[in-house]
């Protein structure tokens, strides 16, 4: 009986310890999705964020466990992070929403892809 009580207390304390993590996910860094879609996220205060890609910057704010803002079409955007995976959502209207997945990448990989995209954009214009 004593062993069962000790094991129960240990199990309960483990669930309490791991279940009460209120830390904000790490949004900052470099992200890559399908077809080399990349963006960088940075902040100075862990509340207001900048999301940058080859097309420019978006601003977002940390609210309700996600980054929230507007895209260049004035549509609501939302970004959630789980470990080294990011999920970017937009287009919540009658047509539904679009969710795209991204993985964390290194600065070197980001810089290489960003340069290639910038060069391609410049030659297109």
Positions of predicted regions on the chain:
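C-terminal motif of bacterial Sec signal peptides marking the signal peptidase cleavage site
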Residues: 16-19
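Edge beta-strand at a domain terminus
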Residues: 92-125
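N-terminal glycine/threonine-rich, aromatic-flanked beta-hairpin/loop signature
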Residues: 37-72
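Positively charged n-region of N-terminal signal peptides that target proteins for export
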Residues: 1-5
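Bacterial signal peptide processing site
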Residues: 21-23
């Amino acid at each position: 009986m004593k062993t069962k009580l000790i094991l129960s207390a240990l199990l309960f304390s483990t669930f309490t310890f791991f279940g009460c993590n209120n830390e904000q996910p790490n949004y900052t860094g470099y992200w890559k999705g399908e077809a080399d879609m990349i963006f960088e996220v940075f902040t100075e205060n862990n509340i207001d964020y900048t999301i940058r890609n080859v097309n420019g910057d978006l601003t977002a704010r940390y609210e309700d466990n996600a980054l929230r803002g507007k895209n260049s079409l004035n549509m609501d955007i939302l970004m959630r992070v789980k470990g080294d995976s990011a999920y970017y959502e937009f287009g919540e209207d009658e047509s539904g929403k679009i969710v795209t997945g991204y993985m964390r990448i290194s600065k070197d990989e980001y810089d290489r892809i960003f340069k290639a995209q910038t060069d391609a954009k410049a030659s297109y214009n």
